[in-house]
Design a protein with these regions (language model features):
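Conserved small/polar residues in nucleotide/adenosyl-binding loops
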Residues: 145-147
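Amphipathic alpha-helical dimer-interface segment in Rossmann-like NAD(P)H-dependent oxidoreductases
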Residues: 19, 107-128
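Active-site loop of short-chain dehydrogenase/reductase
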Residues: 71-72, 124-138
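Rossmann-fold cofactor-recognition segment
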Residues: 44-57
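Conserved glycine-rich Rossmann-like NAD(P)H-binding loop of the short-chain dehydrogenase/reductase
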Residues: 23, 27-41
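Conserved NAD(P)H cofactor-binding loop of Rossmann-fold oxidoreductase domains
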Residues: 76-90
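N-terminal Rossmann NAD(P)H-binding glycine-rich loop of SDR-like oxidoreductase domains
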Residues: 10-23
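Catalytic Tyr-X3-Lys loop
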Residues: 93-114
Length: 147
């Protein structure tokens, strides 16, 4: 049986690599790519759906936009943040920590993926083995913050 998979965070390095690997797998029939990218183009095996991991309503709407009979063999969550282009960066000192930065990091790395589980787990295939997986980068690595 051909597989249907979802990759949440498909624009990041990890998510994009997972998508490329899945597209090369002949047993995969469809890949649903979820990201903040406003990409409405679809390829043969690929469907793009908007999702904002920081917004519960967006996560819910992403599942509501799925075709009614969609069942996933694999849901792969590859979201995460260590830094962004603006205000979030690895803290080298306790003085670098702020409420807003902590909320952003916790939302993207913990709360958002948990909410993805809330809304996406009902779409896992129940008639055969299915997998819900989370993977993030080495956010806790001291080598990344040059201490």
């Amino acid at each position: 049986m051909k597989k249907t998979v979802a990759v949440i965070g498909s624009r990041g390095a990890i998510g994009n690599a997972v998508v490329d690997t899945l597209l090369a797998d002949e047993s995969v029939e469809a890949v649903f790519k979820f990201s903040r990218a406003e990409n409405t183009e679809h390829e043969d095996k690929v469907k793009h759906i908007f999702i904002d991991i920081e917004d519960e309503e967006s996560i819910k709407q992403a599942t509501e936009s799925l075709p009614e009979d969609t069942k996933f063999d694999l849901i792969f969550v590859a979201t995460g943040i260590l830094h962004d282009e603006k205000n979030v960066f690895p803290e080298k000192s306790i003085k670098d920590i702020s409420f807003d930065k902590l909320i952003k990091v916790l939302t993207i790395n913990t709360i958002g993926p948990t909410l993805v589980g809330k809304y996406f787990i009902p779409y896992l295939r129940k008639d055969s083995k299915s997998t819900f997986a989370f993977l993030s980068a080495r956010v806790g690595s001291l080598s990344l913050i040059h201490i």
